[in-house]
């Protein structure tokens, strides 16, 4: 009933506008609430209604509503600001904006994350790590151009995905790459160069050479991908798995901080490590 009344009111308002002046057009803008968890108010029947909001708010005309929860929320936000100040610490610098549409292979942001994972695993386990794999879905927001803050890193990796190391025989590593070739955008990888045509793996090199089916390869990945996350089960293919308590956000933080300490800027582009053709 309430929705019906709202629809009628909106239609009447539209009719009044058409008689008194130019027609009002609403622009739809995509909103990303990944940083704050805020969800935009939206009507179920967007073609006939603008939506309902059952609370007080600050109107677009700037009028300040003193009733309701708004003043209390504002006071709470002011109170926690000092506790959040550390999140604004600059930890590195990025040469260019890096998005994550998850529909393309060889994304710069994915290359960065996979390289960071591979480097961290090699340092942590003190062994050569020939290949690294992580998922685009675990990278939740783009990396901004210019200064990169701790808040950016925390927001990029909100999930508790932990670094791990798996030992895969070359034959199983090839099958893993064949599985990734069937997906729309492969995934974020490091230490390999692959070519895919019509979602079939046609070429693959790891550690600068064709894959030896009998060789054991050290593969850095995340626990989410060990047992079926995103349809990938690295653990089922592995002869040995080592877990850690190292979160992916810390992997990235260490990598970027080391670059910053060395006076280096993060500068990633597509580099052809994964080529997918129709």
What spans do the regions from the language model cover?
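Sec-dependent signal peptide recognition
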Residues: 2-9
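N-terminal Sec signal peptide cleavage junction
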Residues: 16-17
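Feature captures C-terminal
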Residues: 21-62, 107, 111-123, 127-278
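N-terminal, post-signal-peptide region of Sec/Tat-exported proteins
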Residues: 48-95
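Acidic/histidine-rich, surface-exposed loop or edge segments in extracytoplasmic proteins
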Residues: 85-103, 231-238
């Amino acid at each position: 009933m309430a929705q019906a009344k709202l629809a009628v009111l909106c239609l009447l308002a539209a009719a009044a506008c058409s008689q008194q002046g130019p027609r009002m057009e609403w622009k739809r803008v995509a909103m990303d609430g990944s940083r704050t968890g805020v969800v935009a108010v939206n009507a179920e029947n967007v073609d006939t209604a603008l939506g309902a909001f059952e609370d007080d708010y600050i109107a677009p005309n700037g009028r300040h509503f003193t009733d309701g929860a708004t003043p209390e929320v504002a006071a709470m936000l002011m109170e926690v600001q000092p506790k959040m100040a550390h999140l604004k610490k600059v930890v590195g610098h990025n040469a260019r904006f890096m998005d994550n549409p998850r529909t393309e292979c060889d994304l710069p942001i994915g290359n960065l994350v996979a390289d960071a994972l591979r480097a961290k695993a090699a340092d942590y386990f003190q062994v050569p790590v020939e290949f690294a794999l992580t998922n685009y879905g675990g990278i939740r927001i783009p990396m901004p151009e210019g200064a990169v803050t701790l808040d950016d890193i925390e927001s990029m990796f909100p999930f508790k995905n932990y670094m791990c190391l798996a030992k895969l025989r070359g034959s199983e590593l090839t099958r893993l790459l064949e599985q990734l070739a069937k997906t729309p955008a492969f995934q974020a990888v490091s230490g390999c160069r692959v070519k895919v045509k019509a979602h079939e793996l046609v070429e693959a090199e790891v550690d600068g050479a064709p894959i030896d089916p009998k060789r054991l390869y050290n593969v850095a990945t995340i626990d989410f991908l060990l047992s079926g996350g995103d349809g990938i089960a690295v653990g089922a293919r592995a002869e040995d798995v080592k877990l850690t308590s190292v979160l992916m956000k810390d992997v990235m933080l260490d990598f970027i901080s080391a670059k910053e300490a060395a006076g280096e800027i993060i500068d990633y582009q597509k580099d052809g490590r994964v080529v997918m053709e129709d």
